[in-house]
From Swiss-Prot:
Found in a multi-helicase-TICAM1 complex at least composed of DHX36, DDX1, DDX21 and TICAM1; this complex exists in resting cells with or without poly(I:C) RNA ligand stimulation. Interacts with DHX36. Interacts (via B30.2/SPRY domain) with DDX21 (via N-terminus); this interaction serves as bridges to TICAM1. Interacts with FAM98A (via N- and C-terminus). Interacts with PHF5A (via C-terminus). Interacts with MBNL1. Interacts with CSTF2. Interacts with HNRNPK. Interacts with ATM. Interacts with RELA (via C-terminus). Component of the tRNA-splicing ligase complex. Interacts with PQBP1. The gene is DDX1. Keywords: Acetylation, Activator, Antiviral defense, ATP-binding, Cytoplasm, DNA-binding, Exonuclease, Helicase, Hydrolase, Immunity, Innate immunity, Isopeptide bond, Mitochondrion, mRNA processing, Nuclease, Nucleotide-binding, Nucleus, Phosphoprotein, RNA-binding, Transcription, Transcription regulation, tRNA processing, Ubl conjugation. Belongs to the DEAD box helicase family. DDX1 subfamily. This is ATP-dependent RNA helicase DDX1.
Length: 740
């Protein structure tokens, strides 16, 4: 309890955490919880099972509770914002008139865009119709920027249309896409003065107090339009001074600060953000936190954690809701109508409820994207951007929207691009590093070669049912076509999976298949072997986990596997992502994943907590034709076996190429074993029992001790010398004083 309390976690949550036997925070929790409680956006990456869910759930629960408590007691933040219009009452950059990657500090004056490929701009909250006016901009780094003036009609890309005037760091002035030499270049630590004389129709600039001369004459078509301070940035940071602070280089010749302009000269921005500002009145269907998960199982797992963490929170109590598909929407709607504070859900149902107005995002304070790489790989990038655009950037109590992104890897290009677009100066917490295979995992490859192993010819019809990709092809022995070898691979993989289970007498394993139909076919084959879901204790007892199974069945199947009622969990990557299953002794990859990171995710499920684990991958030596649905039904009722490039829904799958990519990614060569799947014992480990802990002090540990022993002895001698020297220095002056 004390360990979590030291990070600022409230006692009620710390008590609940202690009851869960979490005596100390994990590394990811120790790093992330204080950052989130401090109000920052956080990108976090750590292994599955490292406590990521707690790392974001604990601070989210606490801040939601504190927000509700403040509302209950009638407190408001320092910068209460009742409507978007109140933002317009002061001179600042307008949070409702800016590019998607343009960030504005809490003072409204410090601005930044870290997009390196695109320009993102912003205008101020007020403009001017008359008079002579001046403001300053200080450059905080060496990024690219343009500053100046524009009308409400102008593009945010300042100077690229006929309604804006810009001056850029490269020493160019710009108007209507015409870039001409002007003044001189400016960069970090320079201060640019922006002058506007509306009465004469002149625009000019200064650098560090040096007048650069007339830049533009305002054309007649803009004489009756208000001009607003504006800028556009590319990987740059600026700070505006509209006159509230003392100018570094005060203007002369009758120019006055914008903040001192008479009210009659001022025009407020039309972008008041009414649709983007948190409403202060209570809305039952408007949660304070939205947590998006890629699968039902992960969403349920996260919700259960939230229920445990909030166990002792009272007055006000927090109300949570799970929004997932496959469950009657009316039940979810009835809970929404009674009020909800934290929503955990999957994209499909969330999108439905938001688009129909049943779920209101106007009061969301936290947006959490769990397993963001999984969400993006499933094609939910547009959904995430739509959700983010509907959530106000500033809440009713003046707090900024916090975005937390959890990902198995932060090195994904898509995750980086997403973070640049929707996050505000995020802190990266990467405790995962480069992918590697733990010491407790043995992983081997079994080549599936239909040309050398002709077992598939002798099986007749007593083999696993295949996926019907070759239903219209001639796959009979002797055809010697790519289709025949492909069908043979599918048959052999079913046999090899059974052989692996028998050879290693597996009592528990996760079996990964590439598609849902592959999972179903393998389950049916295990039923033919006498096993299946209802055969508790049988050698081939199994359950299936994938997106086409009903939610209740998926939940029940997962629980039965965890309890040990069945030996095997047959699943797809998507269904298994992030599920909290620990210490499984075996994993079988019936097909290698098409994303190399998923290989590490799969085999990382064995050999945890110092328990040895074995991962067996069945890798075809020939190309296999597989389903790759691009149709609108996503495979339901689709029998189009033509190749994708011919308008169909199949591709040729090259597992040998995937294997080489995985080996390159891990910087190792994966051992291959014969089709009899007898795995040779590692010479350092001696006899291995998978699922059991390694022998204490076993392996090559003794060798490490021998190597390090001289260094440790040297350090011990150095420490003794330092301590002795310190004591001599401490007592010697006193002894000298006594003798004198």
């Amino acid at each position: 309890m004390a360990a979590f309390s030291e990070m600022g976690v409230m006692p009620e949550i710390a008590q609940a955490v202690e009851e869960m036997d979490w005596l100390l925070p994990t590394d990811i929790q120790a790093e992330s919880i204080p950052l989130i409680l401090g109000g920052g956006d956080v990108l976090m990456a750590a292994e599955t099972g490292s406590g990521k869910t707690g790392a974001f759930s604990i601070p989210v629960i606490q801040i939601v509770y504190e927000t509700l408590k403040d509302q209950q007691e009638g407190k408001k933040g320092k910068t209460t914002i009742k409507t978007g219009a109140s933002v317009l009452n002061k001179w600042q950059m307008n949070p409702y008139d800016r590019g998607s990657a343009f960030a504005i500090g809490s003072d409204g004056l410090c601005c930044q865009s870290r997009e390196v490929k695109e320009w993102h701009g912003c205008r101020a909250t007020k403009g001017l119709m008359k008079g002579k006016h001046y403001y300053e901009v200080s450059c905080h780094d060496q990024g690219l920027c343009r500053v100046g003036w524009s009308t409400m009609q102008a593009s945010l890309d300042l100077g690229t249309d006929k309604f804006g005037f810009g001056f850029g760091g490269t020493g160019k002035k710009s108007h209507n896409k015409q870039f001409d030499n002007y003044g001189e270049e400016f960069t970090m630590h320079d201060t640019i003065g922006c002058y506007l004389d509306i009465d004469k129709g002149h625009v000019k600039f200064s650098k560090n107090g040096k007048d650069l001369g007339l830049a533009f004459e305002i054309p007649p078509h803009m004489k009756n339009q208000a001009l607003f301070p504006a800028c556009v940035l590319k990987n740059a940071e600026l700070k505006f001074n509209f006159g509230e602070e003392e100018f570094k280089f005060p203007p002369k010749d009758g120019f006055v600060a914008l903040s001192k302009a008479p009210d009659g000269y001022i025009v407020k921005s039309q972008h008041s953000g009414n649709a983007q500002v948190t409403q202060t009145k209570f809305l039952p269907n408007a949660p304070k936190a939205l947590i998006v998960e890629p699968s039902r199982e992960l969403a349920e797992q996260t919700l259960n954690n939230i229920k445990q963490f909030k166990k002792y929170i009272d007055n006000p109590k927090l109300r949570e809701l799970l929004i997932i598909g496959g469950v009657a929407a009316r039940d979810q709607l009835s809970v929404l109508e009674n009020g909800v504070d934290i929503v955990v859900g999957t994209p499909g149902r969330l999108d439905d409820l938001v688009s129909t107005g049943k779920l209101n995002l106007s009061q969301v304070r936290f947006l959490v994207l769990d397993e963001a790489d999984g969400l993006l790989s499933q094609g939910y990038s547009d959904f995430i951007n739509r959700m983010h655009n509907q959530i106000p950037q500033v809440t009713s109590d003046g707090k900024r929207l916090q975005v937390i992104v959890c990902s198995a890897t932060l090195h994904s290009f898509d995750v980086k691009k997403l973070s640049e677009k929707i996050m505000h100066f995020p802190t990266w917490v990467d405790l995962k590093g480069e992918d590697s295979v733990p010491d407790t995992v043995h992983h081997v490859v079994v080549p599936v070669n239909p040309k050398t192993d002709r077992l598939w010819e002798r099986l007749g019809k007593s083999h696993i049912r295949t996926d019907d990709v070759h239903a219209k092809d001639n796959t009979r022995p002797g055809a010697n076509s790519p289709e025949m070898w492909s069908e043979a691979i599918k048959i052999l993989k079913g046999e090899y999976a059974v052989r692996a289970i028998k050879e290693h007498k597996m009592d528990q394993a996760i079996i990964f298949c590439r598609t849902k139909i592959d999972c179903d076919n393998l389950e049916q084959y295990f039923i033919q072997q006498g096993g299946g879901p209802d055969k508790k204790g049988h050698q081939f007892s199994c359950v299936c986990l994938h997106g086409d199974r009903k939610p209740h069945e998926r939940k029940q199947n997962l629980e039965r596997f965890k309890k040990g009622d069945v030996r095997f969990l047959i699943c797809t990557d998507v269904a298994a992502r992030g599920i909290d299953i620990h210490g499984v002794p075996y994993v079988i990859n019936v097909t290698l994943p098409d994303e190399k990171q998923n290989y590490v995710h799969r085999i990382g499920r064995v050999g945890r907590a110092e328990r040895m684990g074995l991962a067996i991958s069945l890798v075809a030596t020939e190309k296999e034709k597989v389903w790759y649905h691009v149709c609108s039904s996503r495979g339901k009722g689709c029998y189009n076996t033509r190749l994708k490039e011919d308008g169909g829904c199949t591709i040729w799958y090259n597992e040998m190429q995937l294997l080489s990519e995985i080996e390159e990614h891990l910087n190792c060569t994966i051992s291959q074993v014969e089709p009899d799947i007898k795995v040779p014992v590692d010479e350092f480990d001696g006899k291995v029992t998978y699922g059991q802990k390694r022998a204490a002090g076993g392996g090559s540990y003794k060798g490490h001790v021998d190597i390090l022993a001289p260094t440790v002895q040297g350090l011990a001698a150095l420490e003794k010398e330092a301590q002795t020297s310190f004591l001599h220095l401490g007592y010697l002056p006193n002894q000298l004083f006594r003798t004198s």
